[in-house]
Amino acid sequence: MERANHSVVSEFILLGLSKSQNLQILFFLGFSVVFVGIVLGNLLILVTVTFDSLLHTPMYFLLSNLSCIDMILASFATPKMIVDFLRERKTISWWGCYSQMFFMHLLGGSEMMLLVAMAIDRYVAICKPLHYMTIMSPRVLTGLLLSSYAVGFVHSSSQMAFMLTLPFCGPNVIDSFFCDLPLVIKLACKDTYILQLLVIADSGLLSLVCFLLLLVSYGVIIFSVRYRAASRSSKAFSTLSAHITVVTLFFAPCVFIYVWPFSRYSVDKILSVFYTIFTPLLNPIIYTLRNQEVKAAIKKRLCI
């Protein structure tokens, strides 16, 4: 390969979720349904927010972008995993693997920052309601959105820069259904201990900073809401609870994946499935069930 004279691995073999043929068929059917649900659920939110003028507010603008990221994030690994359930030999090219890792980290990092932006939006809406539309202006929203993608791009680029310097000259079997960076690094033909620490530090620092910002934002909001009228507090907590649920679902797998990133336990596969597939599926459900405005707009759009 032209990438490096000492690198001879041109493809990687993915072991998938299970070697059982019966389970392969079951997984194929199950994950096909789940993937369709991801696309339809997030697409429904995108269309509803775009075409319903009542939802043209900062909160729903950010929510529609979250749905877009979730839909694209699931699309980078899930379709290939579904097709691989029907294949005896599951392979992916080196550049295909590299692209998969790059976009997974790009979108994952962007989603973390977008969740922070959504927490800021809720803080302004609940703690400074009279100045909400002034503070959360289109210019501010655009800045928050672009900052989210910029941070995701820098995070992903720094992670992938490590990969370009690694020689792969022998082992090429990845015990997962997609190219997971910690697992790919282990296959390099050199000592990668320092590199493993750098990868953990990079992802861990971004996750920690975002998580702390979210904790501070939600802490201030909850403290503020305690002293509001009961009716207003109920509505505020209803909106806030959906955000907290989504944040918990997003960060919980990250904690396990990056606290024990180079372990060989099968729990890593379960967490990866949850992070890349079930979180994008659950997000639109959570926001729809907890939000009367979205439910009403969807019913109107579907003529129910």
Swiss-Prot record:
One GO CC term, this protein: plasma membrane
Positions in the Cytoplasmic compartment: 50-57, 121-139, 220-235, 290-304
Bilayer topology term: Multi-pass membrane protein
Localization per record: Cell membrane
Extracellular compartment spans: 1-25, 80-100, 159-195, 259-269
UniProt KW Isomerase keyword: no
Disulphide connectivity of cysteines: 97-189
Membrane-spanning parts: 26-49, 58-79, 101-120, 140-158, 196-219, 236-258, 270-289
Keywords, alphabetical: Cell membrane, Disulfide bond, G-protein coupled receptor, Glycoprotein, Membrane, Olfaction, Receptor, Sensory transduction, Transducer, Transmembrane, Transmembrane helix
Entry GO MF terms: G protein-coupled receptor activity; olfactory receptor activity
Residues modified by glycosylation: 5
Task performed by this protein: Odorant receptor.
Protein family according to the UniProt entry: Belongs to the G-protein coupled receptor 1 family.
Xref: PANTHER family: OLFACTORY RECEPTOR
Protein name, entry field: Olfactory receptor 4K13
Source organism phylogeny: Eukaryota, Metazoa, Chordata, Craniata, Vertebrata
